[in-house]
Amino acid sequence: MTTLKLNREFLVRHLFALAVFAVLGGWFGFDAFVRYPRTPAAALYESIEKAPPPADMSQAKLDAFKAQKTKTQFVLAIVTLGAALLVALHLLSVAGFKFAFDDDGFVLRGKRFAWGDVKNVDESLWEKKSVLRISGDGWDATLDAWHHVGVKELRERLKSKSL
């Protein structure tokens, strides 16, 4: 039985993106919750703007600058950690998809199907995206060759069954 396996290149790229988003989120979060609140407003202005605050800038304006920059770091932390979460969930979803096939049929979501159970094979996205959609009575599956190794072999098997 041939089992679809997670594409290594897909996995590496998504793990890299996950790491980048997580590190950036941690960095922004550290700035928002630790570094910026502990830094005096004038020193924070100087570290961000690379120049001392103007002489006519009041303490209230410096405090407003600090509050705005802290809020910005907080928002950036939420956005990047949210992106990391979305990448992780997508990766888990793709990794959790199980599909295997042999000469007699295939197993989809733990249920065995015969090749004759396939009622429709949609290859409209194959040339552009290497996506194959198969369906039958009460079930369907979208198989992406970018996500899983073995989809091309499955496509050839479906063609040989002339469905």
Regions found by a protein language model. Name each.
Residues M1-K66:
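N-terminal membrane-targeting/pre-transmembrane regions
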Residues F21, V79-A83:
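Core segments of transmembrane alpha-helices
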Residues P54-A55, R109-K128:
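Cytosolic juxtamembrane regulatory segments of multi-pass membrane proteins
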Residues L62-T80:
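Individual transmembrane alpha-helix segments
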Residues G82-F113, N120:
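Conserved beta-hairpin
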Residues F106-V107, S130-L132:
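Hydrophobic residues embedded in beta-strands of well-ordered beta-sheets
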Residues R133-R157:
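Canonical phosphoinositide-binding patch of PH/PH-like domains
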Residues K161-L163:
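Structured, soluble extracytoplasmic/luminal domains of envelope-associated proteins
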